[in-house]
Amino acid sequence: MQEKSKPVDNLRADAEKIITRAIAAVLPDAAVERALKGKTFLGRVYLVAAGKAAWQMAQAARACLQDNFCGGVVVTKYGHVNGEIADVACFEGGHPVPDENSLRGTDAALALTEDLTESDTVVFLLSGGGSALFEKPLLPLAELQDVTNQLLAAGADIVEINTIRKRLSAVKGGRFARHCAPAQVFAVVLSDILGDPLDMIASGPAYPDSSSCAQALDIAKRYGLRLSERAWALLAQETPKTLENVETQITGSVRELCAAAAAACEALGYEPMILTDCLCCEAREAGSMLASIARTHARDGKNLAFLMGGETVVHLRGKGLGGRNQEIALSAALGIEGLSNALVFSVGSDGTDGPTDAAGGIADGETAQLMRQKGVDAVQSLNDNDAYHALDAVGGLLKTGATGTNVNDVTVLLLRTAE
């Protein structure tokens, strides 16, 4: 049963409901339980979870794994461990750039899964963020951090970044599964990459690598990466192309996130349209595009919702603070100024957006004007990649806290019937 239409000033209340319902639909607990339901593992059972959703996935899995359980390791982002899990050691590390604690957690996982037998099973829970959090570098950590920072600053997408990182790691590109052999690996994957390419999610620690050394070298040259001789040599080496000890199941994706958001929009009286669940472009361009759609349909006399899912990129031009979702909102704010019935929000399903405490940003037709009243130059803030401070000045930051899931971002334009 649909809720009655609300006045324009309730657009933000609608946005909050949509965000809450969409994220709730892709939480990993039930998905992990479904993946493990009816599974019987012979011999000893070990649990390794890596990524921003690792703690929540591990908690659900631990409740299912009772017989022959021999221990586990969780490696997740700072602030994402929400308590103890019986017989499971929990580590927090750096993201999006790995740090010493990322390495400590990975070392613990490698030690736990060393010298296993054919009758043993490693239940491997993988989610977005695993590329930074699950790491055993073949280079000094400082050098690996520098390579990652160069790629991020150049605007490389997640596939390109992972193609490079898996060749500089002892666990990525199928190498963790090879380490676990001859034990069986049952991998449960929460997908954060468009199209669900298993070899790219968290750089594919338990999946054969489909990328080539030629592709890695091309990426490095195209972005002008400054690399040591050792790094160039590693990029020229191939990764495992076959793994016979792994079974993989995908659970959760951006497609499900968009579908849940669309259902929430419909329940609130909007006519939803999912424009794409494979969004991959410059963040500010996505914001401008939605603003153009808003101006086209603002007077249609309907309650409309246009949705996009995916992961945009930000080419750093300034030294400000922000994230891709905040930049979408700031860009949209400039384009929808004066439209009293329009609102745009963009949020990361994991509850984080860039190196900030915000999950994303929200803007309506009054946001740009409010910024001017606060002495904030929205255009300059966008050029400086300083969306965080611009939005913060007008209450435009979305802060959900860590959600425990990670299936990319969802961006929504809401249009209410103009009054």
Regions found by a protein language model. Give the residues of each.
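A glycine- and small-aliphatic-rich helix-loop capping segment at beta-alpha/alpha-beta transitions
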Residues: 60-68, 87-90, 110-114, 137-150, ...
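Accessory alpha-helical/coil subdomains and C-terminal extensions
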Residues: 165, 183-186, 208-289, 293
